[in-house]
UniProtKB/Swiss-Prot annotation:
Defense against chitin-containing fungal pathogens. Pfam families: Glyco_hydro_19 (PF00182). One of its GO terms (molecular function) is endochitinase activity. It comes from Nicotiana tabacum. Residues 1-24 form the signal peptide. This is Acidic endochitinase Q.
Length: 253
């Protein structure tokens, strides 16, 4: 291809092609508006307290604040991470059986029903605990300790806190991001606790103290059901080790 313009014009042309190419590879190239609406098809049901809150634009704006989210690895890895993120957060915000189609009730809630603690669960990941609000706020540039309800009133902030939690290792827990893209290697302690790579250990990261190491239970099955549905929509295999039934939770070492 020949180019007869000035060097500056050539630079601008190349930069534009680089920029548009980069954007095309962003998370929006996989999670289109139509796919988002089909995945979370009942989120705006009139019976849902979150009706009208979780928008596609808010999700994309939040995701773009975390460049590695849904953009790391090959196409399969990216799709698998997106399925896993929405699988876990759909369970956290589920409204149950809103239609005859199973695992379509995600993103029905913004706030935890029990609001006795100031830092009760809010948003897609149901962010709880003052320490998490402080860390998330620092990471995304928002004062959440004194204004925790921003997580329930600003959809972009709400998604940002969920993605922050997803991308961030804490204490002896790896990040969910590292687990699902295959970057996590279990330590000796993890191996002794039966914590192995797969979707199941992400459940352990998020709510292992309640759901893991106690045998089969409906909560874990619900998380798996959402994940399988999204994997099907994204045309990716869910992989192995989907539950945490035999895993010791991270709080037990």
């Amino acid at each position: 291809m020949e180019f007869s313009g000035s060097p500056m014009a050539l630079f601008c042309c190349v930069f534009f092609l680089f920029l548009t190419g980069s954007l095309a590879q962003g998370i929006g190239s996989i999670v289109t508006s139509d796919l988002f609406n089909e995945m979370l098809k009942n989120r705006n049901d009139g019976r849902c307290p979150a009706n009208g809150f979780y928008t596609y634009d808010a999700f994309i704006a939040a995701a773009n604040s975390f460049p590695g989210f849904g953009t790391t690895g090959d196409d399969t890895a990216r799709r698998k991470e997106i399925a896993a993120f929405f699988g876990q957060t759909s369970h956290e915000t589920t409204g149950g059986s809103l239609s005859a189609e199973p695992f379509t009730g995600g993103y029905c809630f913004v706030r935890q029903n029990d609001q006795s603690d100031r830092y009760y669960g809010r948003g897609p990941i149901q962010l709880t605990n003052r320490n998490n609000y402080e860390k998330a706020g620092t990471a995304i540039g928002q004062e959440l300790v004194n204004n925790p309800d921003l997580v329930a009133t600003d959809a972009t902030i709400s998604f940002k806190t969920a993605i922050w939690f997803w991308m961030t290792p804490q204490d002896n827990k790896p990040s969910s991001h590292d687990v699902i893209i295959g970057r996590w290697t279990p330590s000796a302690a993890d191996q002794a606790a039966n914590r192995v790579p797969g979707y199941g250990v992400i459940t352990n990261i998020i709510n292992g103290g309640i759901e893991c190491g106690i045998g089969r239970n409906d909560a874990v099955e619900d998380r798996i059901g959402y994940y399988r549905r999204y994997c099907g929509m994204l045309n990716v295999a869910p992989g192995e080790n989907l539950d945490c039934y035999n895993q010791r939770n991270f709080g037990q070492g």
